[in-house]
Amino acid sequence: PNNKNIVLSAEQARDLAEKPVFVIPTSNVAEGIAAAVAFMPEASAEENVEAMTASIENVKCGQVTTAVRNTRMDGFSVHEGDVIGLFGKKIVARGKSPSEVVKHALKKMIDEESSVVSLYFGSDVTEDDANKLAAEIQELYPDVEVMAFNGGQPYYYYVFSVE
């Protein structure tokens, strides 16, 4: 479903279906893409469910958006209009520019086992800006492959994953 709030509904629909239905419990687009990449056309449904579900366990997902109100959370004092970086349910970075916030958030997400960073840039980000950010991240983390994709999402400057 790519939304943690929809997983339960999808599972209930599966239970009511008269034909076999499988739910991969993805909670965001980055997990959904990782699961889709793990799909093997030659494998059985059960094997695919296992592989796709396992793939989402290796994905860390972050988002960069604009704060809609003043708040204090996770040790950050955030003001309406600040650009914030989220990792899981926590604010992990705050700043004035989306690219600055992505780089700060990635510091909390990338470790020695990380090999790929995927940036999905939103409708308020130009392809040139996204490619520039990807190049900066590549320079910071030369052992990690960095890719930028047009996600077109309206509310997040960036959705990004680390695998």
Describe the function of each predicted region:
Residues P1-E163:
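N-terminal loops that bind phosphate or other acidic moieties
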